[in-house]
Amino acid sequence: MAAVDSEAVHIQEILKDLIRSESPSGGEGTADDANSMVGKVHAAAAPHGTKVTSQAVGPNSENVIEVLEGVGSRAFVIEAHTDAVPPGGRRRWADGDPYSAAEGWVEYLGGDRVAVEVGSHRFEAGIRPRMSKIWEKHRTQRRRRILYGRGSFDNKGCVASALLAMGALARACKDLDVKLGGTVVAAYTVDEEESGSGIKRFACTPDSWLGTHGFLSGPRDREGMLTDVSAVALDGSYGWVPIVGHRGAVQLAVTTRGRAAHAATPELGVNAVTAMARIIVALTDGAEEVEERVGKALNPALLGPMTMAVGTTIAGGGVRAVHMDGAPSVERAGINAIPDWCEATIDIRFPQGPRYPSDVRETKDAVVAAVREYIEGTVDRGGWSYEIRELNSVPPVALAPSFEAAAALPLVHQERRRAGQVLGFEPDLETAPGGTDATFMIHQARIPTIVELGPAGGLSHDVHEFVEVDGVIEGGKILALLAIDRLGLAE
């Protein structure tokens, strides 16, 4: 599409500016703050000739909503979140700057390894096997241009692709004096990395943006899914490969309670930290047995097996605070005391159940029950107690029972066809290891949604994060063409 190619250089400059903006969850900014992530997205969309508004979510956190109005009640939603996780230790990044937006290269080394080159720096790192498959099957060149920095891949490259697509669609409709047979809505949402408050405010209730604009009240199929609205959830991915499902997640906090005593007389106390260590070791060593206890409540055929990450955070005793400026710095007291409390977290990912989607709560409850039962049956407790509480949960998402069935869905079929035209190969279908905002769009808004879609890159939530520049531009073309396929032209 010529309208995309003509903006290729400009969108790269916009993307650099977005990467330079810190945008923590809940602190993405507001449209009237030109230096914030939200302010920059709003300003980038404003010249398109679309209708651009903001939607308050938190005190310093707004969704940006861009609308290209067409004819009729149908809608196609392009959703991309604007927040990014913290950078961690800044000294580990090239030149100590996680927000440099520096230009560079990624080189595929084979064996799930890449080298990231930025200036005089070269870093080697692992990538997901799904991304290695793209390099191995479809790429002859082993080096690709990148932009470097926290949030580049997850998720500012996606935001740039959406901006590029919306601008191209608006320009093409104006130049050709045509209208689409429905409305394209680009939702640049906040807080995906934490609670999902942005997507909920935009899509999930009658008083959400979609609800108040009438898009949630249209016809539905026999499973309750809307038939006049469809969507894609943009998130750092594998180069416009349609993701058709992801596992559910449940995050647990385990608290152990012991008895305090002076460290000089440890026999008079019960150490809650060593008690927690017993639980962590038991669950780590027994992960397969925990999954077996869940048994028939899981159907891993599409989304893969259950996994447990035990001890994702831990604190206890006299720990008061942890400061993360460079190397971690722990503020503590009571080093000379036996700790009477300890808390650790567990992140569990699990596939759908045999009666999905009607059994999503039952499946999650079976997973939590299996963890409790395993601790009760394997960890010897003497003088200490524990409790488990659920912090957060997200249901699994599966667009269909199998890859074959998902490939036959019109939304997925059209995306693969358009990606094939732009990329030179028709991508396979994949599932994602983690969650996206599509969870809420599918389970709450009941909108058919490609679960994850986006440009290639790597190392999200890690140091040396990068996004491939050409993939951002290719995405603008794919999204614009897909919007035309979904809505058609007005007669």
Question: PLM ranges: what are they?
Answer:
Residues 1-8, 23, 27, 36, ...:
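Metal-dependent amide/peptide-bond hydrolase catalytic core
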Residues 1-152, 171-180:
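Acidic/His- and Gly-rich active-site-bordering loop/insert found
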Residues 53, 77, 185-187, 387:
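A structural signal for isolated positions on well-ordered beta-strands in alpha/beta enzyme cores
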Residues 58-63, 195, 238-239, 434-437:
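Short acidic loop-to-helix transition motifs that present clustered carboxylates
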Residues 75-77, 147, 227-233, 251-253, ...:
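Short glycine-aspartate micro-motif
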Residues 91-95, 163, 200-203, 246-248, ...:
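Short, glycine/charged-enriched secondary-structure capping and boundary segments
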Residues 108-128, 211-223, 320-333, 357-361:
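Intrinsically disordered, low-complexity Ser/Thr- and acidic-rich flexible linkers and loops
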Residues 139-245, 491:
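Acidic/histidine-rich catalytic neighborhood of metal-dependent amide-processing enzymes
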